Amino acid sequence: MKIQCEVCEKAEAEVLCCSDEAVLCKPCDIKVHEANKLFQRHHRVALQKDAASATTASGAPLCDICQERKGYFFCLEDRAMLCNDCDEAIHTCNSHQRFLLSGVQVSDQSLTENSECSTSFSSETYQIQSKVSLNSQYSSEETEAGNSGEIVHKNPSVILSP
């Protein structure tokens, strides 16, 4: 099963751009990433040509670790395709960059609430929720901007730095 380029939607994808979380054929990769100096900095990895031979009966790629189950995640640091079980076992407490394979949908809620450490998805959600809570707690009616860019609550004992 060939993975199609997300730009031209015609040619076989040869490159995974980790910054864009997209797969591209070689001509589209050159066209997109040579456009300006910022795009040239994107981290990209080549897709393996022989990956089609290591697939399940449904055509999905196999996990590189167990070689038994369907792979759902790509780990950038390990350069490996992982099933859910192997991903949990290996990446429970580290900060490797992992990408969900195209066509797979997941919830933003963790199934395990009592884990000792959280995945990057959970911590990002928590950080976003914390910022929203902080902003709604100190609304514009209750705050005024100081000269240094600080948010100063009308109660002088509360000072928040951006």
From Swiss-Prot:
Binding residues for Zn(2+) 1, per the UniProt record? Answer: 5, 8, 28, 33
Keyword check for Acetylation, yes or no: no
Give residue ranges of zinc fingers (B box-type): 5-47, 63-101
- Give the main localization category: nucleus
One biological process term from GO is: regulation of DNA-templated transcription
Q: Which UniProt keywords apply?
A: Metal-binding, Nucleus, Repeat, Transcription, Transcription regulation, Zinc, Zinc-finger
InterPro entries named in the record = B-box_zinc_finger, CONSTANS-like_Bbox1, Znf_B-box
Record protein name field: B-box zinc finger protein 23
Annotated source species: Arabidopsis thaliana (Mouse-ear cress)
